[in-house]
Amino acid sequence: MALTVPLIVLAVLLSLMESPASAPVHRGRGGWTLNSAGYLLGPVLHPPSRAEGGGKGKTALGILDLWKAIDGLPYPQSQLASKRSLGETFAKPDSGVTFVGVPDVVPWKRIRPGTTRFQI
């Protein structure tokens, strides 16, 4: 009687273990892939293994459907052509702060102690 309990526990534990055939196959990270410029290209697609059987035509049609769905998505703004001229691209930006009757200077360089930079 004392020997049967450990044998039953051992049998249950062995049945719960994964065999190499039932273990999931990890084929890399998966997910989405980027090109060298950092633009999103699409999902990483792995060809089916020979163990999964035929169905080569079904897989190809599935990949085509996936790419058609992805092509229907809107592109991010960074891929659209910029309408700025070369001069606008390299132009020096404004300070962004203008006061009436006050020359355009860097406001924080003329701050007196005890005042904030937005006081006039």
UniProtKB/Swiss-Prot annotation:
InterPro entries according to UniProt: Galanin, GALP
GO CC list: extracellular region
This protein's UniProt keywords: Cleavage on pair of basic residues, Hormone, Neuropeptide, Secreted, Signal
Cell location: Secreted
Propeptide span(s): 85-120
MF GO annotations: hormone activity
Signal peptide per UniProt: 1-22
Highest taxon listed in the record's lineage: Eukaryota
Coiled coil: none
A biological process from GO: neuropeptide signaling pathway
Protein family: Belongs to the galanin family.
Role: Hypothalamic neuropeptide which binds to the G-protein-coupled galanin receptors (GALR1, GALR2 and GALR3). Involved in a large number of putative physiological functions in CNS homeostatic processes, including the regulation of gonadotropin-releasing hormone secretion.
PANTHER family in UniProt: GALANIN-LIKE PEPTIDE, GALANIN-RELATED PEPTIDE
Name of the protein in its database record: Galanin-like peptide
The species this protein was found in: Sus scrofa
